[in-house]
């Protein structure tokens, strides 16, 4: 643990009812302030379980999660916007339950609308948005509470390939510009290389078996793909999770909050 960390996961253990081995088996993870960390791994490896435990949506058998210096916000695979509210109203919804509801909060929402390229859609309803636009609104809603840690559970998986490529570069710029610490789940290696400062390969019952730094010139998409393929083959031959969770894909609580959670 370091004073430079925004998030620490310490010894996280989780076993689902009926399972013989834990899906999270003493997982440790640190994400630095302003760092973007991307988690790759097979379906059923426990990636989403880990993210939900960090968010406080899933209880742990043991271990803890520390969020340092601010709030936490989460973006899910589907935008899940309220259909009867406008784009602006969806973004400001979370602010209604906070003390910072004044002019400064409204100005920040205006800034987000501009920065995210959706200011012209402020009065639109969700039914009038494309998939990429709706997910931008979902991300803006999470950023509106000014989180220190942003969790993203396959946020671009529902988008078509062209839109996904556009949005992933935009999302990386937003994360860097706002200085947010981000933890993202992805199945797409090229997406992970765009979004992440570090990429970790996650395995059920093991945790992170390999972590790469994307600023390392020796790290390539081919190297990560080969590791992904070899470990998926290993997992298939040595299952550590129930059969219902063993579908493998190759790419195409106890929460302690150090300074408030949003």
Q: PLM ranges: what are they?
A:
Residues 179-185:
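Conserved H-loop
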Residues 55:
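Helix-to-loop junction immediately C-terminal to a conserved catalytic motif
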Residues 161-163:
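Helix N-cap at the start of a conserved alpha-helix in ABC-type nucleotide-binding domains
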């Amino acid at each position: 643990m370091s004073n430079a960390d925004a998030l620490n996961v310490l010894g996280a253990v989780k076993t689902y009812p009926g399972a013989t081995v834990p899906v999270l088996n003493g997982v440790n993870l640190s994400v630095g302030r302003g760092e973007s960390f991307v988690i790759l791994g097979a379906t059923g490896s426990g990636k989403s379980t880990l993210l939900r435990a960090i968010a406080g949506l899933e209880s742990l058998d043991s271990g803890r999660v520390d969020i340092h210096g601010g709030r936490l916000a989460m973006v899910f695979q589907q935008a899940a916007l309220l259909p009867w509210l406008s784009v602006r109203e969806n973004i400001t919804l979370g602010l209604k339950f906070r003390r910072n509801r004044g002019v400064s909060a409204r100005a920040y929402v205006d800034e987000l609308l501009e920065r995210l390229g959706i200011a012209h859609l402020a009065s639109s309803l969700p039914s009038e948005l494309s998939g990429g636009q709706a997910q931008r609104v979902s991300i803006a809603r999470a950023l509106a509470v000014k989180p220190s840690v942003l969790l993203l559970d396959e946020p671009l998986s529902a988008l078509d390939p062209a839109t996904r490529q556009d949005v992933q570069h935009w999302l990386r710029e937003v994360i860097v510009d706002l200085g947010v610490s981000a933890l993202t789940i992805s199945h797409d290696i090229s997406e992970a290389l765009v979004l992440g400062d570090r990429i970790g390969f996650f395995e059920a019952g093991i945790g992170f078996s390999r972590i790469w730094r994307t600023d390392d010139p020796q790290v390539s998409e081919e190297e990560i793909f080969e590791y992904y393929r070899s470990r998926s083959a290993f997992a298939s031959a040595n299952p550590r999770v129930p059969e219902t969770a063993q579908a493998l894909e190759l790419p195409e609580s106890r929460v302690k909050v150090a300074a408030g959670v949003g």
